[in-house]
């Protein structure tokens, strides 16, 4: 395998720390200077000694900043006039800018500094001139209202442009200088002002609407009470009852009026549902994205040993809120009404809008069972005129029940949007998976090494293949071929074949199921080899093994392979190197189970049971989640599941052991059940187009070529190795094999009827050795397999002289 060249060296840590300390020092210096100048200006006294005049009482200084402060204030007032008060505020603005960008490295630019200095000069000159033109002279200052600068510039401008023209000129120069010096965007100021105005308008409008609605309801109630009174009077008057009956009727009317009044009071005091705020600004990009933006040449430079930039993916669209708090509250009120029509009394507690669905958390009344609400899911979907409604019976840490209703306008979650988050960038695992966003729009990042295997299921069109592509690309954007290796099995010959040629592949993309069985068998053998290596090294997992190998290499004493068997004295054991994490991806698991059958299930079960510490992980995907495909043996060893949209509740229970997947929306909408929990998380999967996949594959092809291991698929390439469907038996006679007699001789001499022993002795594949042992069993040379998996040799050994 080709060794990758090291990545470009990063900025030294001491230089980064120096940049941060310089910024902190500049912040402290700016802040102290601002406070000192403001204190000197506010406590200025003309009797203090100064630059523009002398003082008879030089020994006593009234200025709080001392003699130096008195001189500074006198100079600033002499030159700038009233504008001297603005000068410390400008320094405070620069201190605030240094504080905002304190986590970014220090970057000196002479051109940018000169540009900021020009803006400051324009700002000071224009401000002083405006102060001279529009303010009167004060006896307490050493100069005019605009100082020496303002007086000179103001008089010149008034002679040429008059007061109005001079004012317009200096206002324009003042705004220009303010923009250049503070990097202020007036368009952004207008946007913020407009947003605040609209928010205030919506607030007042909502309050007015609530007051008007309450007033109308009160009028309606009063009218109903009057109508009831009239009907009672019409009924009671002709009969002329006695005084006791009249008193009882009046008491009933008073009680009814009091009940209605109490109902109206409770309705007015009803706390409205809390609407969770949507993210007003996009997620802060990660350090990797900022680094790629600062180095645009990095996009086109395909250097071996580097990772492709995230910028080759399609950028995310700008998120626009397609709802208002009033519309969400209206749907919540409608939900309460519909549930009340079905005899379930609830109140909406909070509303959580998201990119695809909105979750309404409701508080059931006392005595209402959650099962009653769950059984009304289809009726609610019909009543609310939506495609489906999902009921979340248990929300951890809350007493509410979740009702998830799809949004009218669904937002697309771009894959680049998830990869650009700090959560993905800070993940250390080489098999980090970026799945998408949760219902609140937050990224969902998980680690395949902790799962340690994943079962994915969903019908056609549910987004299953796109989800598998997103998982593979997550690994390709996180790890190089020295950290992660892939074995891809693609029975459909369409989905995973586009990854052919990337350097992460251990073997070509497997499309023949005979090769798939051999690839899984090689994975089991590699798992056993790694466990033996780790046992010899005294470590418990792959990360500990790699750490020990790295420490030995750094110390200049690389470790030799302890499992190497020397054939001669002169042979030297090869040196140990870092072992990559291996991910086996099967796109259509059901098709492989139909063709290969029981043997593959046993191999998958062995990998799922033991391969976590060895760094071998499985991703099994199928569009037919039936019990004959996802068997109990596989489900018991793969606790992490991912269910896309399925056709029935039975299929949902087959995948995640509970319903809910049949109510998903498709197109990437999934239920992800992390390991160690039985509560699934609803995730909106990230969308990856075919063009993006091709761009990533081409980027990796430019960075290196694959180094295939021929031993992975060699088992089916042995001469005379037929393959017959799911049984795995050869179609030709095993006794006609050229090595059959030699195999019988070895078994009789060693008295060991083991497939692995014959395989090692004759250096042949597993299938061929198994057929020879089965032929010996049929010929009566060995017995059938015992309960412990061993065989006994029946035929006598060769006669020795």
UniProtKB/Swiss-Prot annotation:
GO terms for cellular component: plasma membrane. Disulfide bonds: none annotated. GO terms for molecular function: ATP binding; DNA binding. Residues 715-736 are annotated as: Disordered. It is a multi-pass membrane protein. ATP binds at residues 461-466. InterPro entries: FtsK/SpoIIIE/SftA, FtsK_4TM, FtsK_alpha, FtsK_dom, Ftsk_gamma, P-loop_NTPase, WH-like_DNA-bd_sf, WH_DNA-bd_sf. It comes from the Bacteria. Residues 441-653 form the FtsK domain. GO terms for biological process: cell division; chromosome segregation. Residues 188-801 are cytoplasmic. The chain crosses the membrane at residues 24-44, 73-93, 117-137, 167-187. Keywords: ATP-binding, Cell cycle, Cell division, Cell inner membrane, Cell membrane, Chromosome partition, DNA-binding, Membrane, Nucleotide-binding, Transmembrane, Transmembrane helix. PROSITE patterns: FTSK (PS50901). It is found in: Cell inner membrane. It holds the Pfam family FtsK_alpha. Gene3D superfamilies: 3.30.980.40, P-loop containing nucleotide triphosphate hydrolases, Winged helix-like DNA-binding domain superfamily/Winged helix DNA-binding domain. Belongs to the FtsK/SpoIIIE/SftA family. Essential cell division protein that coordinates cell division and chromosome segregation. The N-terminus is involved in assembly of the cell-division machinery. The C-terminus functions as a DNA motor that moves dsDNA in an ATP-dependent manner towards the dif recombination site, which is located within the replication terminus region. Translocation stops specifically at Xer-dif sites, where FtsK interacts with the Xer recombinase, allowing activation of chromosome unlinking by recombination. FtsK orienting polar sequences (KOPS) guide the direction of DNA translocation. Consists of an N-terminal domain, which is sufficient for the localization to the septal ring and is required for cell division, followed by a linker domain, and a C-terminal domain, which forms the translocation motor involved in chromosome segregation. The C-terminal domain can be further subdivided into alpha, beta and gamma subdomains. The alpha and beta subdomains multimerise to produce a hexameric ring, contain the nucleotide binding motif and form the DNA pump. Homohexamer. Forms a ring that surrounds DNA. This is DNA translocase FtsK. It comes from Pseudomonas syringae pv. syringae (strain B728a). The gene is ftsK.
